[in-house]
Amino acid sequence: MKYFSSITKTKLYFLLLITNCVYAQKYDVVIKNGRVVDGSGNPWFAADVAIKSGKIVGIGFFQTSEAVKVIDAKNQIICPGFIDVHTHVEDGLQKLPTADNFIYDGVTSIITGNCGGSELNLAKFFDELKQIQTSVNVGSLIGHNTVRRYVMRNVFRDPTPKEQVQMEALVEQAMKDGAVGLATGLIYIPGTYSKTPEVVGLARVAAMYNGIYASHIRDEASKVKEAIEEAINIGREAHIPVEISHFKISSKPLWGQSNTTIGLVEKARLEGIDVNIDQYPYTASSTNMGTMLPSWALSDGDSIIHIRLTNAETRKKIRTEMLKNLKADNRQNFDYAFVARYKEDSTLNGKNVSEINKLLGRKTNAETEADLIMDMVDKGGAQMIFHKMSEEDVSRILQYPYTMIASDAGVIQFNKNVPHPRGYGSNARVLGRYVREKQVLRLEDAVRRMTSLPAQRFRIDNRGLIRVGYAADVVIFDENKITDKATFEQPHAYSEGIDFVLVNGVAVLENGKHTGKKSGEIIYGKGKLE
């Protein structure tokens, strides 16, 4: 009996040992000793966060022995991963799937397809991303410009009834493939040629599949109020939630009137129209040089555009409109417009139009600068940076409770071209400059704008909060150190102060360095057919 008892005790000992080992490592990751800002806007609280199989499974206090990996977040903030709702990654993400500029800025999920430009075949796009794998989660809108160009090319006219039906069918297919909504870019070709009823028809289709309507509105300068009203009216007519992209005032005579433009949004919300806005925290925008020309000049394809831009009479007409717009903006020249990327001559990158004009030995006046712009557009155009906004408006818009933070950026190849710094530092800039330094926002409010508010707006389930059952998209940062380092003069610099970024429970950024891990997933819209 003693022998049997000894054997039994030995077995029980090893059974308990094995059980304790299993119990000891029941979590993949435990983040300890931090202050949790959960994304709701509520005050921070002290807690550990436990992660298992890509999900948050516990919020409380845990032993280090319970986890395979322990992250010490002492004196740091633990918050949900940032959701960037306005990006353009259609090309770049497949070339650089690690999306470094986003990860270093704390972004774990992105929405692409904005400003009316997306992949047409989203099922194929999503499949390709799943094959290459990415470091960020990705969702997409379906672009109005993409659909219109496919059906009508770049013609300057209304669609026929048949063409309208064709466009609506393409939007419907995209929604079934998982688009989160419809996006317009109403200053771009060919979307700028559309009238409101055309867009309403497409938005109604997106609404049928629980999508939203995101719009780069028709004018962000002298007619910005009318453009905001149009976006709101599309929401009203189509019964669809509205997202006004990169909300701004880029007309000098209207600087300081953001209280009025925000008021239009608030009035619509009081009416029962679901309107939100997003913003990048900079006083400069970035888009293509073609937007500096009247839209009619860019219709009907490259060959026709070339004829217009080399015809003396047509050039005169274009120049007259450009100078009229310049005067309306209370400007004497085009020195606000900087070249970010010009394939024809990269030595011009980083210089403004006035500087380039002088460099080429031309007369220093607005007329010759307008001619230079036409010449550059004729040679393929350039990506530009426009310094046209006021700090007062940026700060006021940022404080509006329904404003989200968005970069309006793509995947950036480090040290190539002279891009807008927003692609590197939008979130860190808000947390460093506007929360810590200027105290425009509470920390908890800023985090909400980057996390749960975007998730709610784009109907992204189980992300955007530190909550049990939610995806373990987590950012850990030092609120006293987080800062953007990218500037307009030196844009290629990653944000600092973010130590860890977890995407679906996997450390993609660890101790401030990208690990190369690609744990991102596809974010499908509610209309996705299984």
Report residues per predicted region.
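Divalent metal-coordination and catalytic microenvironments
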Residues: 34, 49, 54, 75, ...
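Histidine-rich, glycine-flanked metal-binding segment
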Residues: 26-31, 36-81, 484
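Divalent metal-binding pocket/active-site signature
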Residues: 173, 179-231
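C-terminal cap of metal-dependent C-N hydrolases
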Residues: 34, 395-402, 408, 475-521
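Acidic, glycine-enriched loop/beta-strand segments at the rims
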Residues: 36-48, 354, 381-394, 441-447, ...
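Bacterial Sec-dependent N-terminal signal peptides
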Residues: 1-26
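Divalent-metal coordination cores built from histidine and acidic residues
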Residues: 73-78, 82-89, 94-184, 203-210, ...
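Active-site neighborhoods of metal-dependent hydrolases
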Residues: 141-142, 150, 154-161, 165-189, ...
